[in-house]
Amino acid sequence: MPLTEVVLVDENDKPTGVMEKQEAHVKGELHRAITVYIFNSRQQLLLQQRAEEKYHSGGLWSNTCCSHPAPGEETLQAAHRRLYEEMGLRCALTPMFTLTYRLQLDNGLIEHELGHVYFGVTDDVPQINPDEVSSYEYQSIDEITQRMMMTPEQFTAWFQLTFARIPDYWQAFKSEQSR
């Protein structure tokens, strides 16, 4: 069953209510979100191209997956659920950071989210859900950086915003994993 409600939060991530997902994006209400970055053993990031039929940002490239936890669902649980539903992958996920952003999308919707960002590593082959994802590819952080500078219009607004933090967090994640 598709998620229809999001958890509204304050700037400290304390729940303040529940709202229908589309309404929250129309009104620009701050709500909880999850963002997942999956890397392979070659240190390449798994990118997804959003399905054209998505209600916003269809056809654009983005991080491995992102979504919203359901009311009462923990963010880690939501991250695992959406990683499997969108990409057919299961792997350990590590919480890395949170960030709050407000982005006006081209179609008039507003992404006002407090996002919980997770990293994971797997060499499993994605089994994409065509309702969510039209394609995928692995690229190094340097390749993505170059591509984003050349053709930013090919990427989702939130990916462009969060990606700026990824190189430093990836280095910290790798250091922690090698201990």
From Swiss-Prot:
Domain of life: Bacteria
Pathway where this protein functions: Isoprenoid biosynthesis; dimethylallyl diphosphate biosynthesis; dimethylallyl diphosphate from isopentenyl diphosphate: step 1/1
Co-factor binding comment: Binds 1 Mg(2+) ion per subunit. The magnesium ion binds only when substrate is bound.
Active-site residue list: 66, 113
Keyword Isomerase in record: yes
Top-rank EC class of the record's enzyme: isomerase
Protein name in the entry: Isopentenyl-diphosphate Delta-isomerase
Function: Catalyzes the 1,3-allylic rearrangement of the homoallylic substrate isopentenyl (IPP) to its highly electrophilic allylic isomer, dimethylallyl diphosphate (DMAPP).
Residues bound to Mn(2+): 25, 31, 68, 111, 113
Positions bound to Mg(2+): 66, 86
Main location: cytoplasm
SUPFAM superfamilies from the UniProt entry: Nudix
Disulfide bonds: none
Catalyzed reactions: isopentenyl diphosphate = dimethylallyl diphosphate
An example molecular function term from Gene Ontology annotations: metal ion binding
PROSITE patterns, per the entry: NUDIX (PS51462)
Cofactor(s) in the UniProt record: Mg(2+); Mn(2+)
The family this protein is said to belong to: Belongs to the IPP isomerase type 1 family.
Single biological process term from Gene Ontology: dimethylallyl diphosphate biosynthetic process
Location relative to the cell: Cytoplasm
Keyword match Signal: no
UniProt source species: Pectobacterium atrosepticum (strain SCRI 1043 / ATCC BAA-672)
UniProt keyword terms in alphabetical order: Cytoplasm, Isomerase, Isoprene biosynthesis, Magnesium, Manganese, Metal-binding
One GO CC term on file: cytoplasm
